[in-house]
Amino acid sequence: MRTGPSNETGSSTKATEMTALADAFRDTFAVEYVTAREVMDRRAREVGSRPMVLVDVRGEEERAVSVIEGAVSAETYESTRSTLGPHDCVCYCTIGYRSGQYAEKMAKAAAGGTDDARYFNLYGSILAWTHAGGACVVPATGERTTRVHTFGKQWSCVADGYEAVYFKRPLAKGFGQMVRGWFGRKK
């Protein structure tokens, strides 16, 4: 893993980079998007509304660095979703590609069934979360952190005040995760 300085460019430049990355595939997935600010506002008024679950679909090594406070892994979500009742599932990854795939897959699987979940993709994912000033925590300790795993250097456009951590060889790591996904998960 490598660590990138959080102040390589100005915050507005990094926000522009993040938006360009997120917009590059926004129309790729047949899912609704929600912004980081909308999630934050909804969490602030959660009482009496439909429950919302944040699902981090990134790999275990990425999640070990930090997650959005209150998020669960895809594995945890899948093993507990039948006990949640009607809820909204907001999926995220680094920039929104993997979470878009996951949200679309889950929405298709739920269609026509008894699953009363609605699936959303967090626009810009954890990168957008940093630009909105959202809290991240280390899952092992629950302590707040400004370190965020961005998978690869090209996605390290976290907001000022956050530190990007990424794989040295993201394509090799991504291919390994993809292969494990093919053979390691039940459909």
What would you call each of these model-derived segments?
Residues 56, 92, 122:
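Active-site-adjacent beta-strand anchor residues
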Residues 49-50, 69:
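Sequence-level motif detector for i,i+2 pairs with an aromatic at +2
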Residues 94-100:
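Gly/Ser/Thr-rich loops at beta-strand to alpha-helix junctions
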Residues 34-49:
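Glycine-rich, flexible N-terminal cofactor/catalytic loop recognition
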Residues 2-37, 60-88, 100-187:
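Rhodanese-like catalytic fold shared by cysteine-dependent sulfurtransferases
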Residues 53, 88-90:
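Structural motif
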Residues 39, 51-58:
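Short hydrophobic beta-strand that contains or immediately precedes a catalytic carboxylate
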